[in-house]
Amino acid sequence: MGPRGRGRAGFRGGGRGRGGAGGRGRGRGGSRGGRSFGRSSRFDTARVEEKESSDEDESGKEMGSEVEEDSDVSMSEDEEEETPQNARPYMALLQGFTESSEPSAKRRKLESGTSAAPAQAESESDEDEDEKKVEDLDRVEEAEDPMADLAEEEEQSDDEDEVDASDPFDSHFTTPDEDLTAKRVRAIQKKDWTFKRTMSKVSKAVVTYPQVEDSDAPAIPSPISSLDGLKLKQKLRETASKKLATLNPLQQAIAPTIFSYSDVLYDNRNTQNSEGLRQLVCLHAVNHVFKTRDRVIKNNYKLAKEENSDLELRDQGFTRPKILFILPTRQSCLKIVNTIEELCAPDQRENRKRFEEAYTEDDVKFSDDKPADFRELFEGNDDDMFRIGMKFTRKTVKYFSQFYNSDILLASPLGLRMAIGSEEDKKKMDYDFLSSIEMVVVDQADALLMQNWEHVEYIFEHMNLQPKDAHGCDFSRVRSWYLEDWSKYFRQTIMLSAFNTPELTELLRTQCYNWAGKVRFQADYAGVLTQLGLKARQTFSRFECRSIDKEPDARFDYFVSAILPSLIKRAKSSTGTLIFIPSYLDFVRVRNYFATNPAVAALSFGTISEYADVPEASRARSHFLTGRHKVLLYTERAHHFRRYQLRGVQRVIMYSLPDNPIFYREIAGGYLARSEQDLKLDPGQGTVRVMFSKYDVMKLERVVGTQRVGKMIQEKGDTFDFV
């Protein structure tokens, strides 16, 4: 079975550290942002207080107006993934291509799934039919001919197409210092990295670079005041200046680093700065495409002019696609595409109407109480299974271009994983279109973590490998570092996230090999302890564990031995206890303990996870409000995708902190404040109990603040109270 991944794809042992299931499919429910559910067999045990059936009817009526018709997620199993084979040497690669020099007909899944016919008017009830319809949205019938339009373009007289040593595009890709590059690549191969901490205009920064003797450490470029400080194509500068006449302080500070082709991890993305960051990465991507394209056209003209010369012009990769955007939803893709259009102002837009039909959804789906970050992610078309190619010519941008004919690829992790194909049928797998990617932009990485992060890892593992087929490649034009299998050392990776996590740090460490180094912008956090909006006692309890692989067991043991006894002791007065559990695997463990262990028989409980359907979640919320469920187990992903306004909460126990500090404020502050307003809780009587270990340092810093986190991790005492 291939990587279908509908819903939160399954988990292998621990979901690579997320402790949960994986990738959502079809947005927050049905296709194209629909409101339907699909899920596998579920554990259906909850213990309720024995009451008359009439009580259940009353509680249902009481919650009827409160419970939103929110849908949940569907889930699928995750597949075992094999490590790709080592790339073949250059000579073996050439021998493999000698049998056929002509572009072969496209035989991969992308041909039937890269782009789409218009959606059918009538919805299909059958899931398979529904999947086919959604995949059709991105179908492409175009033949593979990656360089055809470039060969037909006339060369334009443009002195800026000449090599400029001060232009990062040329110094990084076209004419890099061969000696320095070779030394740094060898250092990277030996995993010989070093780092330095510095300050930028907007935050602290950690610069990581390959350690080479007689080489100065890379420095963060100085801020710029306008677009004049960037090496842009003149025609792009003219159009982009209308949209970016002035730069805000963040853009001024971070733009030079992005345009220097260093890897970048920026972990303070939010709803206020997201548009400015999107403008920068789109401008950088289009500038890279234009420079690559114009250089190829100019060299085509030179070669045609001197047919019998020994002129060697290496300006290409194995395949045409150079930019990859990895995005969470079709709506986020729409925003990227619209920004690109605004910056480059093409004369013609081929297939634009079809693009709007497939990626636009104007219906307002959410009530006014949903927060800004939720709206940014889920309003519009929240389908998370898509992929689309964009091709640029001198006056036109074409949507739904065949992948091998495209300059920019935009895809969700699930959509791109399905385009690659299944590990079970390796002959049909195709990831050659990723072989020459020179820039990857991972936007809203925090949202991708709530999907199936293993799809993201899989994509990176199959990027910049030497291709299995020629795809019409002219090897006399391929840059030497491609032939040496060094393309991954030249690729730039840009990750934008609301916060940092171990997964992002690990991806930067294990899959980003840029010889120009890496820059991680590191925010200082004031914490959200004082932003709850009410007075509540907040107690943080640290438990010890020797290694990270023992941490789940240590956390559960601490919960059973130190947290539960007090609840059991006052079982009669434990009504309104919300236990927040970020990891789905931890949730299953705690749920099973509540369901089967006689020690907690006095505690009636309900559950809301990411797999709960609408009636199940509504019933659990109703029983919790009326007291039939004294305890409610609630997962982070359920909150991420639904943002339920739970009522009746009188105390909060956090089995672990959420990655998103906004969730802490909403759960610890918002829920308790609502109970005070409903007179379910006396003012100031709400309590919050948090479990944490030294491995939760990133989460803890965002909640308690940068100044407090060190003491809480290192001090001898293990309990910290805040009021």
From Swiss-Prot:
SUPFAM superfamilies: P-loop containing nucleoside triphosphate hydrolases. Residues 52-83, 138-167 have a biased composition (Acidic residues). Residues 10-36 have a biased composition (Gly residues). GO terms for biological process: maturation of SSU-rRNA from tricistronic rRNA transcript (SSU-rRNA, 5.8S rRNA, LSU-rRNA). Its main location: nucleus. Keywords: Nucleus, Ribonucleoprotein, Ribosome biogenesis, rRNA processing. GO terms for cellular component: nucleolus; small-subunit processome. It comes from the Eukaryota. One of its GO terms (molecular function) is U3 snoRNA binding. It is found in: Nucleus, Nucleolus. Residues 41-51 have a biased composition (Basic and acidic residues). Residues 1-177 are annotated as: Disordered. Belongs to the UTP25 family. DEAD-box RNA helicase-like protein required for pre-18S rRNA processing, specifically at sites A0, A1, and A2. Component of the ribosomal small subunit (SSU) processome composed of at least 40 protein subunits and snoRNA U3. This is U3 small nucleolar RNA-associated protein 25. The gene is UTP25.
